[in-house]
Curated annotation (Swiss-Prot):
Protein name according to UniProt: Pentatricopeptide repeat-containing protein At1g62670, mitochondrial
PPR repeats: 44-79, 80-114, 115-149, 150-184, 185-219, 220-254, 255-289, 290-324, 325-359, 360-394, 395-429, 430-464, 465-499, 500-534, 535-569, 570-604
Intrachain S-S bonds: none
A GO molecular-function annotation: RNA binding
Location(s) in or outside the cell: Mitochondrion
GO BP: any one term: RNA 5'-end processing
SUPFAM superfamilies in alphabetical order: HCP-like
Transit peptide residue numbers: 1-22
Main location, first listed in the record: mitochondrion
Species assigned in the record: Arabidopsis thaliana
Family annotation (Pfam families): PPR_2
Length: 630
């Protein structure tokens, strides 16, 4: 029965053209050009028929396949179209779709007519290359020549629709298959189910399984694998479990792939214990875990800080002679680094190298981070240079890690050198890169360079975020440049970016420390109008400002308001008020505050104890105050 398709207008423009844009096959790629020249130069000593045998095709490499094509088109008479289709199919299985398309063009140029099979292969290749209009054009030409597409051809086209984000047309295609007498097979249904999950249509995908069964097409392991994978990626692990039980109750036995998918989904959605239970369950059922199973569990355990459990799993997999891969080692190394166990991380790295497993960029970046955290910056730089020598080129994350290390330990100039080196390698720093540098330069007291880097960031098209502005404002305020900070703050308020409570706290503190307590108080009072609730830092900053100004009553009133507002005072609030009372000579009020502070679980800080000690020496206080603070 002939099926009628509405070929899109974009495809119709291609129908009269040849299979691909005209041109020499050598234009496909430099490597293909070499293979092509080889195919038509010199004589070969083998018979193409021998190479086209089943065993010959299974061992065929791309350059040999192209050379074989050259031999075939030189033969007279031409080999049969069936033999050409065998070769094109073999190359398509290598995922060399461009090569297949180009060879198909050459066949047409040489007058070798395509048939149903070669057209189907070409449609599949165009779809796999996300060139759906060209696939539709080939379909149109194929049908014009009287060839009816079969279910394999239509399944390829279906895949093209799914990957071209034309999912409604994909669904319509399957519906039309039924109407016109085609019987979609498992591959067809699996393709559409996968496409539906790709486009967040999980309910439609699940409903399609029931429709599939109703049409007499039983789901296979691939079907369940696609569905389980789709559900787990959405976090629907309960539904995935239900499907697993359904499989076990039926004739299908879920293998390690299905279990791995669910375990990985459970890990990603923080159901660690469920993942471990499923791991035990698969073992009791005789399903042997593989490196993927262990790697998922180890990575998840590491993310939870359960590095000892992760280490036990690593030992377990080695005992079972399941070789850990770079992903397994990298996850553990990163976990040890974050736990501050750099020695253990280095031992794992040595073990990895001993096993001839090439470290990845993640492995190197984790170790560089570890060295930076422990102020072993020279070793971090050596590791950085070593990874480059191994042709494992650092990305922006690696550079950021090293730059942050140098800035943290006051070696900002070296951090700047790394930043410039990154630019020379053609990598553009991201927002995090610039934030690190701006903060490092301010901490080093180089306000001018910090501002220059901010300007460079904007001119390079790297978008500042609220953290950038907070860093800039904090640096300017702490370096006594309140007026410049005010200009930046006013610009920020006019922009679409929302200042956070941290932003306001920076400005309130900057104003108070610059003696502009009233300005700080105005900004504090306006917080509620901006929809921002003051936090304990905001209250403490303002209380400290009032105390510094000598406005004792305002400080007391704000302290009372703070508690009434439901914001619990912290150690800083109490110590600030205690010191203010002691300086005013109000020993009774300070003693009451000390008792209240101690009842809340806080103790005197270094500044308060230092003040009390000095007053003891001066004879202005007795020892009982020091005892109360201890």
């Amino acid at each position: 029965m002939r099926i009628s398709f509405a070929i899109a207008s974009t495809a119709k423009r291609f129908v009269h053209r040849s299979l691909v844009v005209r041109g020499n096959a050598a234009t496909v790629s430099p490597s293909f050009s070499f293979f092509w020249r080889r195919a038509f130069s010199g004589k070969t000593s083998y018979d193409y028929r021998e190479k086209l045998s089943r065993n010959g095709l299974s061992e065929l490499k791309l350059d040999d396949a192209v050379a074989l094509f050259g031999e075939m088109v030189k033969s007279r008479p031409f080999p049969s179209i069936i033999e050409f289709s065998k070769l094109l199919s073999a190359i398509a299985k290598m995922n060399k779709f461009d090569v297949v398309i180009s060879l198909g063009e050459q066949m047409q140029n040489l007058g070798i007519p395509h048939n149903h099979y070669t057209y189907s292969i070409l449609i599949n290749c165009f779809c796999r290359r996300s060139q759906l209009p060209l696939a539709l054009a080939v379909l149109g030409k194929m049908m014009k020549l009287g060839y009816e597409p079969n279910i394999v051809t239509l399944s390829s086209l279906l895949n093209g629709y799914c990957h071209s984000k034309r999912i409604s047309e994909a669904v319509a295609l399957v519906d039309q298959m039924f109407v016109t007498g085609y019987q979609p097979n498992t591959v067809t249904f699996n393709t559409l189910i996968h496409g539906l999950f790709l486009h967040n249509k999980a309910s439609e995908a699940m409903a399609l399984i029931d429709r599939m069964v109703a049409k007499g097409c039983q789901p296979d392991l691939v079907t369940y694998g696609v569905v389980v994978n789709g559900l787990c990626k959405r976090g629907d692990t309960d539904l995935a479990f239900n499907l697993l039980n359904k499989m076990e109750q039926g004739k299908l036995e879920p293998g390690v792939l299905i279990y791995n998918t669910i375990i990985d989904g459970l890990c990603k959605y923080k159901h660690m214990d469920d993942a471990l239970n499923l791991f035990k369950e698969m073992e009791t059922k005789g399903i042997r875990p593989n490196v993927v199973t262990y790697s998922s569990l180890i990575s998840c355990l590491c993310n939870y800080g359960r590095w000892s459990d992760a280490s036990r799993l690593l030992s377990d997999m080695i005992e079972r002679k399941i070789n850990p891969d770079v992903f397994t080692f990298s996850a553990l190394i990163d976990a040890f680094v974050k736990e501050g166990k750099l020695v253990e991380a280095e031992k794992l790295y040595d073990e990895m190298v001993k096993r001839s497993i090439d470290p990845s960029i993640v492995t190197y970046s984790s170790l560089i981070n570890g060295f930076c955290m422990h102020d072993r910056l020279d070793e971090a730089k050596q590791m950085f240079e070593f990874m480059v020598s191994k042709h494992c080129f650092p990305d922006v994350v690696t550079y950021n890690t090293l730059i942050k290390g140098f800035c943290k330990y006051k070696r900002v100039e070296e951090g700047m050198e790394v930043f410039r080196e990154m630019s020379q390698r053609g990598l553009v720093g991201n927002t995090v890169t610039y934030n690190i540098l701006i903060q490092g330069l301010f901490q080093a007291g180089d306000c001018d360079m910090a501002q220059e880097i901010f300007k460079e960031m904007v001119s390079d098209g790297v978008p500042p975020n609220i953290m950038t502005y907070n860093t800039l404002l904090d640096g300017l305020c702490k370096n006594g440049k309140l007026e410049k900070a005010m200009v930046v703050f006013e610009y920020l308020q006019r922009s679409k970016m929302e200042p956070t409570i941290y932003t306001y706290n920076i400005m309130i503190e900057g104003m108070c420390k610059a003696g502009k307590v009233e300005d700080g108080w105005d900004l504090f009072c306006n917080l509620s109008l901006k929809g921002v609730k003051p936090d304990v830092v905001a209250y403490n900053t303002m209380i400290s400002g009032f105390c510094r100004k000598g406005s004792k009553e305002e400080a007391d009133a704000l302290f009372k308001e703070m508690k009434e507002d439901g914001t619990l005072p912290n150690s800083g609030c109490y110590n600030t008020l205690i010191r203010a009372r002691l300086r005013d000579g109000d020993r009774e009020a300070s003693a009451e505050l000390i008792k209240e502070m101690r009842s809340c679980g806080f103790a005197g800080d270094a500044s308060t104890i230092g003040l009390v000690t000095n007053m003891l020496h001066d004879g202005r206080l007795d020892k009982s105050f020091l005892d109360m603070l201890s």
